[in-house]
């Protein structure tokens, strides 16, 4: 039997504007999700027919269980959430089950869209990666999470339409709604979505004016007493739309930082912003090596932001020169952001300070990070503007 997380949906189907509704047909995988990939229509559960008007997310067993457990945990935290707020969150009418045999339609695009998921598991017979030819022999390694089908994502809406003033106002209103009405309620209950971005906001098929937040695969909840740091935060992958300070949530980084400061103190070297910068610079280099994709996305955003502004003022206007300038701008911004956090939440580093040096990462998480990580996510929608060519916008003169 499927595991179910249901509440009755009393909404009435209304005639909708097709530009908000994803009209593709078939069972093919069509979008990557956090730690999994999504199929439309839903994949059948073992012993059950496919559910109409549902989609399926295929995940490795451990990730499926974590995501489903967190959806249940978050739902229990949000029992008193106003209906006018919860309508923006896809948390109800969700089930987890064993996947039935995948049909030829289900296998379309599976290696392209689900490649990141399939490569994590080896086929029992060949010991090679799972692919379209052998996945049906390895379904015991996967679960599916079935959820109500929604319309087109905000990302695709922006990608598929000319952005005129009406569309821009509508997108801005979505961001404002989340910042003012949705995220504060999540913050109060200690819930972090952790992966807010334009592809994870889909328009409701019942009411196209309601942008619904999906994909809770990177979510977590804070401790009830708002002390300490959730264990999950130490293991989740860094996303490009996260605050730059996210990589500080590592026990190794914290231990290295405190050890570095104690060494400076022992050698009677004055601890200043510039001396701490010596520690942060190699951390940034390590971040680039370990998070190449995230780094390249952020660099492209910075490049689009500054490209037109500084090009006219540099003598060497070659691509390599421009790339070096963007690299310097981004690295300086990143390093200074992290420095601000370290300086603000490190105690006993003053010239006359006594006692042990303490970096209070827990205080930073509960006072600041808990409240701004999803804000960074929702504001990342604006990044897409920066990546569009000017011809994408249809603005009256």
Where are these regions (language model features)?
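ATP-binding glycine-rich loop module of kinase domains
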Residues: 34-122
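Arg/Lys-rich, intrinsically disordered low-complexity tails that mediate electrostatic binding
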Residues: 1-21, 25-26, 147
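Conserved structural core of kinase catalytic domains
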Residues: 85-170
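Conserved hydrophobic alpha-helix
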Residues: 182-186
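Activation segment signature within eukaryotic-like protein kinase domains
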Residues: 175-176
